[in-house]
Design a protein with these regions (language model features):
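Carbohydrate-active catalytic/glycan-binding domains of CAZyme proteins
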Residues: 1-229
Length: 229
């Protein structure tokens, strides 16, 4: 059609003022517009999917990259489970939701693409036409003194979006090659620019691991992409 579709994160909970950092549950919300510049109209009656008790997405079912593949839309959404008992650790992964109607409900795969132990969230996909390989960029969550933070951008690759292998991954950005932000590397988003792949990400100068006062970083990978040997 001629409408732009947006899936965005919503939550009824935040940290106290003034920061108001979103907190669980993370939900997938829907809006649409006739132009990417807006105005955007929220669609509260459209519920793509929600966290479900007893599943790998019982705490988080938040939006991710959407791609049309073999006649249906796949959304690579962020999923998580939080332990019931202290210290109430959080386990994160990526799941696939499917639909043929972007304004309708989605069905969620019974298992994530990789185990919860991977501790990843957020997605951005790139398809390398040279060898028909899909690359999924995501961020890894680490814990320091009980505080969680995104410490690296990882990439997974596959030739079939329905089949993933957790061993087929590599570190793209972390403290070893991102010197301006020695601790925080999060929310990678990729875009082809000429013969390079641009990677936008957020970071924070200094030794803090705060959610606030972050900057946007830019890195590049040469194209075509090739899995490391």
């Amino acid at each position: 059609g001629k409408m732009w579709q947006m899936f965005y994160l919503g939550t009824p909970h935040t940290s106290p003022a003034p920061d108001r950092v979103p907190s669980f549950p993370y939900l997938t919300m829907k809006a649409q517009s006739s132009s990417p510049m807006g105005p955007w109209q929220k669609q509260p009656n459209v519920v793509p999917f929600r966290p479900m008790p007893g599943t790998y997405y019982s705490t988080t079912a938040s939006p991710g990259f959407v791609v049309k593949y073999h006649g249906e839309y796949l959304q690579f959404f962020s999923a998580s489970v939080q332990d019931e008992h202290p210290p109430k650790l959080i386990h994160r992964t990526i799941g696939i939701a499917r639909t043929k109607d972007l304004n309708g409900p989605w069905s969620i795969d019974p298992a994530p693409i990789v185990p919860l132990a991977e501790q990843i969230e957020n997605t951005s996909l790139y398809h390398e036409e040279a060898d028909k390989t899909w690359y999924l960029f995501t961020d890894h969550i680490a814990v320091r003194k009980g505080v969680e933070y995104s410490d690296a951008a990882w990439v997974y690759w596959t030739n079939d979006l329905n089949r993933w292998d957790g061993a087929k991954k590599a570190v793209v950005l972390d403290s070893k090659n991102c010197k301006w932000s020695p601790n925080i590397v999060g929310l990678p988003s990729v875009l082809k620019v000429g013969n390079r792949l641009a990677i936008f990400y957020d970071g924070l100068p200094g030794n803090e691991i705060s959610h606030m006062n972050r900057d946007v970083g830019l890195a590049f990978l040469p194209l075509p992409l090739r899995p490391p040997k």
